[in-house]
């Protein structure tokens, strides 16, 4: 797959194109230009490190939405075995913006639930661009309650712009579905591990992100509203999105300082989409450690900690 570069990555894109051209020349001729290729590769890596070491919150938001970033089904394929997808909420319909089912993690049976976006236009429409309707959240809850019944740990992957704001979704109880999930997750009698892998958009993300451990990938975001939405409300123009992103504090490192996130999972150079394999290794290492820890904590303590975590959301201090 040809890499897609964001606007602030254009200097990297130019070097990458030049490297590709030199490789083509070397393949088509007897001229050895490997030293020049290696020099440009090092220059590209150094430039990428420099750019990504000083990303603004608005740029991190762009990376979190990158079209080639790994989605929930990519993590399921890489980290789990024997995945059996489960469908439907048993009330209205099957929402393809939420995927989930039974799987094995290192041989242990677990329940996996997550948001799913699409790669191409057809799939994006089918998945509703990763924005669940009420039936999606009710499906997620049905799966998590099934996990509780059989004593299976729950692992969730969060990647959504937010809950779908359509009229039909509101008529079918969007806010009730999200609120019910928050309530039930605080009292679910099994370990719950949550990982933000892309966008963590408001209540649409929180509905599957109440857990014993909450992780974020290095270039993922988590906020009550998108920077563009915030700017449109406060300044009446989306052009102020960069200012909104700065004020919202949407980045993983900022949220970890506020004790809203347990672990920030390091991404490969250039973001998770540049090296799926390394990304999966990093995520797996964290989940292995946390699952072992969660299963060693008495259930009463686990539930108390989980409840205290969500009740701490929204607290603030004036400086």
UniProtKB/Swiss-Prot annotation:
Work out whether the entry's keyword set contains Chloroplast: no
Which keywords does UniProt give here?
ATP-binding, Cytoplasm, Fatty acid biosynthesis, Fatty acid metabolism, Lipid biosynthesis, Lipid metabolism, Nucleotide-binding, Transferase
Annotated CoA carboxyltransferase C-terminal domain residues? 39-293
Tell me the Gene Ontology biological-process terms attached to this UniProt entry: fatty acid biosynthetic process; malonyl-CoA biosynthetic process
- Extract the HAMAP family matched here: AcetylCoA_CT_alpha
Please state which protein family the record places this protein in: Belongs to the AccA family.
What's the protein called, per UniProt? Acetyl-coenzyme A carboxylase carboxyl transferase subunit alpha
Record organism? Neisseria meningitidis serogroup C (strain 053442)
As recorded in Swiss-Prot or TrEMBL, the protein's gene is named: accA
